[in-house]
A protein has these predicted regions:
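Secretory targeting and sorting signals
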Residues: 3-38
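Soluble ligand-binding/transfer domains with enclosed cavities or grooves
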Residues: 40-172, 176-197
Length: 197
């Protein structure tokens, strides 16, 4: 009958220690290589001179578009943005250019109320400080006049000023930037640029 040799106690401890070290190393490797469960933090885009579009800060984005972005930077922001989601509900609005309209607009226009679904809908402008709803526009996707890429078209054909045509893009979550155009007989002219939030 063969006799079993007992394992050396020093060797038994070393085997246990090795198993523990390997288990800890495997757990650490799994934690390091495991995918993150949190959503990535959106990154702000800095166009220079304080013109920063920050997806995590709606108020800072509106402030930048109103007071810090040059017309060229505003155009770059618009061109770099996808069409985005269509606005829904009451949105405050501010004219960003030209300066004379930026100063006059708050007495005449304070935003828009959107009645929309995922593919568009219609809106009413909020006019005067009382927010009276007027000047209906139909909303649908169309190529932007400025670059031909998809945009939300705000067509004022059903309003008293059918020559007016706006286009907007969601430049940051909950913030839309766009242009208001006058469609004349011979040419289409930019009237102003505006932001909604």
């Amino acid at each position: 009958m063969a006799r079993e040799t007992p394992m050396n106690p020093v060797r038994r401890i070393s085997t246990r220690r090795l198993a523990t070290v390997l288990s800890v190393a495997a757990a650490a490797l799994l934690m390091v290589s495991a995918p993150a469960s949190a959503d990535p933090v959106p990154v702000a885009t800095d166009y220079g001179g304080g013109c920063v579009i920050d997806p995590a800060n709606r108020a800072a984005t509106v402030d930048a578009l109103r007071f810090r972005c040059s017309p060229e930077q505003q155009d770059a922001v618009f061109k770099a943005s996808p069409r985005g989601a269509v606005p829904s509900g009451v949105k405050n609005g501010w004219v960003t250019r030209p300066p004379v309209m930026q100063a006059l607009a708050p007495a005449l226009w304070i935003g828009k109320t959107f009645y929309t679904g995922p593919d568009g809908g219609w809106l009413m402008n909020r006019v005067t400080a009382a927010g009276i709803e007027a000047w209906r526009a139909d909303i649908y996707t169309a190529p932007a006049l400025i670059d031909g890429a998809p945009t939300w078209a705000l067509n004022y054909a059903p309003s008293p000023t059918p020559q007016v045509y706006d286009e907007i893009r969601e430049v940051s979550p909950g913030v839309w930037f766009g242009y208001s155009w006058w469609r004349g007989g011979l040419q289409t002219t930019l009237l102003l640029a505006f932001v909604l939030a």
